[in-house]
Amino acid sequence: MKCILALKALYEKRESAMKLGLFFHKFKKRILSMTQDRQPEITSECMQLLRLISEHYVGVFSSMEYVFLFQFVYAAYRPMATAAGELICKRLLAPPPQEGVFGQNPPDEFDRNIQNMKTLIDFYLQGEFHRHVPYLVDGLWDAAPALVRNWECMTALLLEPRGGRQALTSQQERVLIEILVAAVRQAAEGHPPAGRELGKRASREVDGTRRWRERASMSRHFVKVLPQLLSKFAADKEKVTPLLQIPQYCNLDVYDKDGLGSDLDSALLELDCLVQRHSDVAVLEACARAYGAYCCEGGSAHCQAAPACSRLVDMLVDALTPLLDVFLQHEKQGQFLGHHEMGRICSTLRRLVAFYSTHDLSSWNLYEKMDSLLTLRRHQGSMPTEVIHCALQCTYYALLWQIVAATDRLPPQVGEGLGGVRCGYG
């Protein structure tokens, strides 16, 4: 460690760095191998040393050696990941133009960020660490804030028309959405993803005022563009599902403070369309959680969102009731419904189950309807598996919400002891 720190001090000065060329070429392999040391503090200091060395010598590392070093942005130790992120910024991404170098026509900063984001997406796709987007974002969080926190750049790329000058491929869009959602989460929560170690000397305190301002700015941006994003990617469940997480991380009070009621209407309309369009469980559960964020009691979106959610559930229950009546009648007579009718029953039940997992639907008496189904199953002995499964899920959530309601009526001392029943729903 002492040797690395001493070398860092020398390489921070160009005069002394230029005298160490032969030394580095002799010990290059040894220094590179130290990035894999067992002590994380040594690996991060070594990565910072290599970044300094790369700034002084042209062509000092081969392309394969750079690829090897860049992958440490996914390291579990945050200082190491940040150091690798700094190297990525220096060697992979286009730097901001220096004053006077380009005369009167410097490159447009927005276009530069667009190109850097495309480069970052391709870097991720070419790597071997898929499913680690939050780690990549966190590794660049301090090294490239103008890139990974550039909401305008990311959403502009996603909203680029098909065939446009900056249009992405479908695979690039999917990765950018993952990057966007990971960055939104980190901006809202103020801490790295789970599993990333901060380091001994890292400050765990976050400037609350700065984070509040960043979140407010982020929220004002997304309440305007989220309806457009949901509309564009409505047909693609893999892309729209992560986008539906964004409302959970935004400060939705901006709807009231900034007079953005029409944007809220647009977001709720898109949610309604998604629920009616999709029957995939992941999409439906994401829609239910998004509605939950908008319907939060005391929030400025509650007055518009809660009635919209109730109307949607009304529509689903109204559609389900006659279907169930016909289904029960056929089952009692030993007859079978057609494939189309069974599909409608199952898809409607899936939608209601998704909402029941997040919202208290006790007012719609779904328990009684599900009890009728399960009673018939007990007597008749045959019923489609998915219908039984959905009926059991509805019954399960109905009972859980009754427990929640009973807990809320208990004295505080008793209710605190039962607080764990809320975990996983509500």
Positions of the model-derived regions?
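Hydrophobic, aliphatic-enriched repeat segments that assemble into extended interaction scaffolds
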Residues: 78-89, 148-189, 367, 371-400, ...
